[in-house]
């Protein structure tokens, strides 16, 4: 998306000579026959003593290619590159000069520049034409003695003003087309690029040639196309913003759908999601997928990263200080902002071959943003992947994505997908379960630890707890509350029993003492595993929401669950990836409706 930049215009009339004027003077052709054909003697004096005709004709020749060496910042009124405002003094006058000065005070040339000595200008122009191998055309009045230069310049200005009004010059004929395409006040920048000379330089075109004009016209066309694309992209983003307001749902639908998605992931049946929520059929865009987006099924508008690339450095610096969404901008990023690299920054060193266990990877994790649009939002699947990457010890970036703002760059990055998803060395990964498997296979020892469980039972422990919680928290009937609470307690008791049961490696066959209660910290031992990354975020949500909206707490006799949670709260990999309690409570503020 092309950004509107500050146009570098120039003041009209900064050219020493009017454009395209071919003034020969009335009654002067007869002077061509004076003194016979003594062109050789007069040719040496022509650069200094040329009259208004040669001066004007040389200026007309210079219109095509004097952009780079002139002190006025590129093409002037003669050139279509500067837009419609840069016209001759006769056509635009003082208002055009004032407007150009306001837009680019440094690029504006004082009116006094028009009074530059004509002899010096003609000399530079003539030499430029000769350098192209073209014989300069010398009108008849060039062989007569120069008249009053003030009167000559006045005549030239008057005639050039008539030509400007009549549209005689080629540059002025193109200007209305440029204005129509680019829109009001959308003049292109100096097409030659870079500094184009100082104001003190003479306006002679020593290196003038028609080629720069062709290049300039091509640049104008390209930039105009960019402006049109930017306008279309802006309109698309505006339509998408209005569409987002229509499709946006409240926190209750988000939490309810999220619970159902968690249950569906646990049971491996996406059909169950529709049965539990009863809201999927009403969604306008069912093709959008993502376990954490809840009922806010919004498709990001069309767009690209190009619009943000110009501001990527600024956005990366700001993102180090706060959590914010990507994806913009400019990438800002409009869609989200990076939280910064986790586990430090990549060290400079020799490039490693692909497949080397020590190879650094370019990893970015996109997680759901909170209701403020910046902080980490309530999403157990986002936290699951966050924990896995942290435990692996790999360097990665985290970007929060605000679904309500519908970042345009996500449409190109992961069309139809809501967070969490990941980019790994430029490859987009969207399925949470497959991402977990991929990371376990790709990030292997000795550089990265193995996170798989040693006991298969640990993977299924507590897999029905969140489903029972969802039914319990969404129930609004008091007479049914006891039933749902008992179902939840039954699932929790099953989990507590597994946590208190000693694992085989905890039992010492040679010991005379029997171990009856496990003292391990986590599901599969004293280290966090993939099973913990899956269960702990859900268990934490149950603890916060049940207490807030149902005044329900895990029974104190469930020592296994309390030991499990307390050990998790002592680990940075868990606490630093958890959303704030207020984020979790806000997500369920309407889903946990009051019982009647």
UniProtKB/Swiss-Prot annotation:
Monomer (soluble state). Interacts with dopamine receptors DRD2, DRD3 and DRD4. The chain crosses the membrane at residues 381-401. It is a single-pass membrane protein. A motif (G-site) lies at residues 379-382. Pfam families: CLIC-like_N. Channel activity is redox- and pH-regulated. Inhibited by IAA-94. It comes from the Eukaryota. The active G-site contains a monothiol Cys-X-X-Ser motif which mediates glutathione-dependent redox catalysis. Members of this family may change from a globular, soluble state to a state where the N-terminal domain is inserted into the membrane and functions as a chloride channel. The redox status of the active cysteine in Cys-X-X-Cys/Ser motif likely determines the capacity to adopt a soluble or membrane-inserted state. A conformation change of the N-terminal domain is thought to expose hydrophobic surfaces that trigger membrane insertion. Residues 34-48, 246-290, 338-348 have a biased composition (Basic and acidic residues). Coiled coil: none annotated. Phosphorylated. Residues 148-160 have a biased composition (Acidic residues). Its EC number is 1.8.-.-. Residues 118-130 have a biased composition (Polar residues). Belongs to the chloride channel CLIC family. Residues 1-360 are annotated as: Disordered. This is Chloride intracellular channel protein 6. Residues 425-596 form the GST C-terminal domain. It comes from Mus musculus (Mouse). Keywords: Cell membrane, Chloride, Chloride channel, Cytoplasm, Ion channel, Ion transport, Membrane, Oxidoreductase, Phosphoprotein, Repeat, Transmembrane, Transmembrane helix, Transport, Voltage-gated channel. One of its GO terms (molecular function) is chloride channel activity. It is found in: Cytoplasm; Cell membrane. It catalyses: chloride(in) = chloride(out). PANTHER family: CHLORIDE INTRACELLULAR CHANNEL PROTEIN 6, CHLORIDE INTRACELLULAR CHANNEL PROTEIN 6-RELATED. Signal peptide: none annotated.
């Amino acid at each position: 998306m092309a950004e509107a930049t500050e146009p570098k215009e120039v003041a009209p009339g900064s050219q020493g000579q009017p454009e395209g004027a071919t003034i020969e003077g009335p009654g002067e052709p007869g002077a061509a026959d004076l003194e016979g054909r003594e062109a050789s003697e007069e040719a040496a004096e022509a650069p200094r003593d040329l009259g208004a005709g040669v001066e004007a004709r040389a200026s007309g020749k210079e219109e095509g290619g004097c952009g780079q060496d002139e002190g006025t910042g590129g093409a002037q009124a003669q050139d279509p590159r500067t837009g419609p405002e840069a016209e001759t003094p006769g056509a635009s006058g003082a208002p055009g000069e004032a407007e150009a000065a306001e837009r680019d005070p440094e690029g504006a040339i004082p009116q006094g520049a028009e009074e530059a000595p004509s002899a010096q200008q003609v000399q530079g122009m003539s030499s430029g034409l000769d350098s192209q191998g073209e014989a300069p055309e010398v009108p008849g009045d060039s062989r007569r003695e120069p008249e009053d230069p003030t009167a000559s310049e006045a005549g030239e200005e008057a005639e050039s003003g008539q030509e400007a009004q009549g549209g005689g010059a080629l540059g002025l004929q193109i200007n209305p087309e440029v204005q129509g395409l680019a829109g009001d006040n959308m003049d292109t920048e100096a097409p030659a690029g870079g500094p184009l000379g100082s104001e003190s330089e003479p306006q002679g075109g020593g290196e003038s040639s028609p080629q720069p004009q062709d290049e300039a016209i091509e640049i104008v066309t390209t930039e105009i196309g960019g402006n049109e694309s930017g306008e279309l992209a802006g309109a698309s983003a505006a339509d998408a913003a209005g569409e987002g307001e229509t499709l946006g749902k409240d926190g209750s639908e988000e939490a309810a759908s999220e619970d159902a998605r968690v249950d569906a992931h646990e049971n491996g049946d996406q059909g169950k999601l529709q049965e539990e929520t009863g809201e999927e059929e009403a969604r306008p865009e069912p093709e959008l997928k993502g376990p954490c987006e809840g009922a806010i099924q919004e498709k990001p508008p069309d767009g690209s990263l190009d619009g943000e690339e110009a501001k990527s450095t600024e956005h990366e610096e700001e993102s180090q200080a706060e959590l914010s969404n990507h994806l913009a901008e400019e990438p800002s990023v409009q869609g989200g902002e990076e939280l910064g690299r986790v586990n430090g920054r990549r060290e400079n060193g020799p490039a490693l071959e692909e497949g080397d266990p020590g190879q650094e990877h370019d990893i970015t994790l996109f997680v759901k943003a909170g209701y403020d649009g910046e902080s980490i939002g309530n999403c157990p699947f986002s936290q699951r992947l966050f924990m896995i990457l942290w435990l692996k010890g790999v360097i990665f970036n985290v970007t929060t994505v605000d679904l309500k703002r519908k970042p345009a760059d996500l449409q190109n990055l992961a069309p139809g997908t809501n967070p969490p998803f990941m980019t790994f060395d430029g490859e987009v990964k969207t399925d949470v379960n497959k991402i977990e498997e991929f990371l376990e296979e790709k990030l292997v020892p000795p550089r990265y630890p193995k996170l798989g469980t040693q006991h298969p039972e640990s993977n299924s422990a507590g897999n029905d707890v969140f489903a029972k919680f969802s039914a319990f928290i969404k129930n609004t009937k008091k007479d049914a509350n006891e039933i749902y609470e008992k179902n939840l307690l039954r699932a929790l008791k099953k989990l507590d029993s597994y946590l208190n049961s000693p694992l085989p490696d905890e039992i010492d066959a040679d010991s005379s003492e029997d171990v009856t209660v496990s003292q391990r910290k986590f599901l599969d031992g004293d280290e966090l595993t993939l099973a913990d990354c899956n269960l702990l975020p859900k268990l934490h949500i149950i603890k916060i929401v049940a207490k807030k909206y149902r005044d329900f707490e895990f029974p104190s006799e469930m020592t296994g669950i309390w030991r499990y949670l307390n050990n998790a709260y002592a680990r940075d990999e868990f606490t630093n990836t958890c959303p704030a309690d207020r984020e979790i409570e806000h997500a369920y503020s309407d889903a946990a409706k009051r019982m009647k």
